Amino acid sequence: PGSGVAIVVDGGYQNAKTIEYAGNNQAFIAWVDYREGANANIYCQRLDVGMNGLFQENGLPIANTTNQETKPRATFVNNETSFITWKQGSTDSKIFYQFVDDDGLVFDVERPISDYDSTQALSRVKRNSTGEVFVKWTDYRDEPTNGDQYFQKIDVNGDRQWGNGIKVDSDNSRDFGARFSGGDEGDLNVVWERGTFPEIEIMYQNIQSDGSY
């Protein structure tokens, strides 16, 4: 057996990694990096089939500010482009995203998943067959205690398609535990849990390509 390939050997603590196919038989890896001490940042690396890193040694910084940047989630878009999202901040946190190709960062600055001024956390991502990316997060704009599950669609150019996000459940009950899969026509299929124990139901919704349902 092999001994493995070091993705990062710089000082500090690294965790919360994510790995996805990146096109051209490459892999995209991102992680939370504490090389600057208590300040958490997001770094990434691409590996070719020979397990060679294609970015700079110890990784390319994606989010490197004085804020805490954690919870990276990645997926493949198309060609050699990857999508990554993460949480910025601790209390009043926000969700941001970026495209990364084989040359590095695609956007000059990271993009917010929503312009609505609310606390955002707990993102998940999936792509569909055409490379559109769907992002789920917990948003506290209407429910400050438990939050609600919101969704955003990002097209292959990196532009948001669903405004400030689509709230999947308009009921006043608690909603949580969403799992989702992109459809063939730009739509999204979502299942989630509604209610509180012991009265919990499994719900389903199809969000159409334009964000309606």
Where are these regions (language model features)?
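Extracellular, repeat-based ectodomains that mediate carbohydrate processing or recognition
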Residues: 1-213
